[in-house]
């Protein structure tokens, strides 16, 4: 293993989980936090549940980020509405690669206009969970079949840093996939998750929404509409839908509409 310095910018559920996993794998792991979360981390450290035990991660906790504090990879794990503030804060830092683990359809050019061309590596996390009232992380990676950590160069080309990032994830036992068009992948991802989220919020009993036929039918109709719309546009511009998730979506959804 090549020793890498990693900064996690954002200490919510996603950032905290990746920080814990990178630290377990032996990487020089640092996490940047603010406000109450920073105070909690400084007082108690980053604690997380694993196999019914509470473990304290071996990481460095930061409340500020000097420009000359350089990392091999900076993982940006903030909410979308915090993205531009974070990019502005990172623009003068000398680290070369910022992995934007954010669900956003904004133009990557806008991000590069802030931090500089060639620094952005778009990505999407594969994890979920919560932080309880005691500040203890209870989270897990999503299975590879459902949602691996996904990333790509903006150009779609392979690069030395995508190879290095793959190795980091592999060594930390984090499922991942490299795609050729991250923006297209996120479009497809939203086409799927928005109808599912709508079903959750429309139900009076979200935990058993799968038993509500009317909502499930509406969800299937929305999914089919989204995929057909995406497919028609992508066909028009000569692109290809990501194969791992979207092969022949209309046929499978037709079964749910009968």
Can you say where each PLM-predicted feature lies in the sequence?
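NAD(P)+-binding Rossmann beta1-loop-alpha1 motif at the extreme N-terminus of oxidoreductases
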Residues: 2-54
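Residues at the starts of beta-strands that form the adenosine-phosphate
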Residues: 5, 28-30, 97, 119, ...
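Active-site-adjacent beta-strand anchor residues
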Residues: 8, 31-32, 76-77, 101, ...
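Conserved beta-strand termini and adjacent loop/short-helix elements that scaffold enzyme active sites
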Residues: 32-34, 51, 62-64, 123-125, ...
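Short, charged/polar "capping" segments at the starts of alpha-helices
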Residues: 37-40, 106-109, 161
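Rossmann-like NAD(P)(H) cofactor-binding subdomain of soluble oxidoreductases
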Residues: 54-138
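Helical "substrate-binding/catalytic lid" subdomain
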Residues: 183-258
């Amino acid at each position: 293993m090549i020793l890498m310095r990693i900064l996690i910018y954002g200490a919510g559920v996603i950032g905290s989980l990746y920080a814990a996993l990178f630290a377990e794998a032996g990487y020089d792991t640092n996490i940047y936090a603010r406000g109450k979360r920073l105070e909690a981390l400084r007082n108690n450290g980053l604690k997380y549940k694993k196999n019914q035990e509470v473990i304290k991660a071996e990481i460095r906790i930061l409340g500020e980020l000097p420009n000359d504090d350089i990392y091999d990879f900076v993982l940006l794990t903030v909410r979308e509405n915090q993205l531009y503030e974070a990019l502005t804060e990172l623009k003068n830092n000398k680290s070369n690669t910022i992995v934007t683990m954010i669900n956003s359809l904004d133009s990557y050019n806008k991000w590069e206009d802030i931090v500089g061309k060639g620094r952005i590596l778009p990505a999407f996390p594969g994890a979920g969970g919560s932080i309880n009232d005691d500040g203890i992380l209870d989270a897990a990676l999503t299975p590879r079949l459902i949602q691996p950590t996904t990333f790509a160069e903006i150009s779609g080309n392979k690069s030395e840093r995508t190879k290095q990032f793959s190795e980091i994830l592999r060594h930390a036992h984090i499922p991942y996939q490299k795609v050729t068009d991250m923006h297209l992948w996120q479009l497809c991802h939203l086409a799927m998750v928005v109808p599912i989220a709508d079903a959750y919020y429309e139900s009076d009993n979200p935990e058993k929404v799968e038993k509500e036929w009317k909502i499930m039918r509406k969800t299937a109709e929305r999914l089919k509409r989204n995929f057909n719309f995406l497919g028609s546009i992508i066909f028009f511009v000569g692109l290809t839908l990501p194969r791992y998730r979207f092969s022949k979506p209309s046929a499978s959804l037709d079964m749910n509409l009968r």
